[in-house]
Amino acid sequence: MEHTPRNAGFALPAAYMSTMTSSFIDFLKAEAPDLLPRARVENMPAVPGGGSAFEPPHGTTIVASTFNGGVLIAGDRRATTGNTIASRDLEKVYVTDAYSAVGIAGTAGIALELVRLYTVELAHYEKIEGVSLSLDGKANKLANMVKGNLDGALAGLAVLPLFVGYDIDADDPKRAGRIVSFDVTGGRYEENAGYHAIGSGAVYAKSSLKKLYDPEADADTAVRTAIEALYDAADDDTATGGPDLVRRIYPTVVTITAEHGAVMLPQEETASIAESVVRERSERPGQLG
């Protein structure tokens, strides 16, 4: 009796088994370009005078700062459509590999696709090459992805990530945390001040960080400083959501250190800090901003 192989008729195309490139994005460009974030932009209906036919939700404020032995990134949870709150609990900060994380501002849907694809890109590279990308390599990968959305940015669908990472090859482990920002053309910028913010509330968050930032602070102090900066941003920017004690919605925070790598803080921990900040501010209303 003739034996039929179990996988007969289900063989993957040769391209799926190729190791010619360690880039998952290059693979998608060749085999399934419709799955790239830019495809969504290209397929959106146009309106007279340019732009898109609707206003999608936008993510708002992300802050980052270095501390003694690491770096952190934090974001509020609000997304807006015009002057309307589109979401109160959007996650905008993501761990992307063992020693890096990304926060997203801008067009929410495209930004979420971009950061998920970026996470797969880093994992794919490590599986093919057997080593992870250097920190500069990770930042350059993300810059190229942002550049790939330039048409979307010109159509009003911009995405701006904020990248943080711990450089395991740094000479000084205490100063190994790094922050990299980007513009819509894919330009990447090292933020050597030790802190940065992006999004609609960035100017208020950076003003707060400028007063509170301490490069010698430990991780706990740095987390509180970041949450205070988001609180200050929400106090003046309607598109930034502050701690919501009623709904129990609090900022998202990721810390990165040599010992623990990239770790998303449990909500219970951020809730405790956020509630402490709100309580302290309510006790000294003259200093609310």
UniProtKB/Swiss-Prot annotation:
EC top class, as a word: hydrolase
Subcellular location: Cytoplasm
Active site: T60 (nucleophile)
Propeptide residues, chain positions: 1-59
Main function: Component of the proteasome core, a large protease complex with broad specificity involved in protein degradation.
UniProt cross-references to InterPro entries, sorted A to Z: Ntn_hydrolases_N, Proteasome_sua/b, Proteasome_suB-type, PSB_actinobac
Keyword presence, Protease: yes
Official protein name in the record: Proteasome subunit beta
